[in-house]
Amino acid sequence: MRLKRLRKELIKRGAIPYLITDLKNIKYLTGFSGSNGYLIVSEKNSIFISDSRYEEYAKSVIPEDCEFFLQEGNAFEAISSTIKKRGIKEIYVEASN
């Protein structure tokens, strides 16, 4: 539900996908409360990225319309690979807290 609201907001603001890195915001949007996760939200879908420690847990708590992507290697490589595979040309990055 919260992700759907964020998607609607993205559409209003030009539909550029958003990379969320703050775990508090990820928990608020997805329910995931682990220590490693990244969320890419676009107007069409959401992609949750985490390592194998959290695969089963993440799949059990993230919304059904949020795809899980297994992080192999470092986080930057996983995020970069996901962005390239989706053909994303621009992305907003959450400001650090």
Descriptions of predicted regions:
Residues 35, 54-57:
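Short, surface-exposed beta-strand-loop junctions and turns on beta-sheet-rich folds
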Residues 66-76:
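Short acidic-hydrophobic, aromatic-tinged amphipathic segments that line or gate anion-handling sites
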Residues 1-49, 76-89:
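Terminal domain-start leader segments
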Residues 21-23, 50-52, 72-73, 93-97:
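Structural motif
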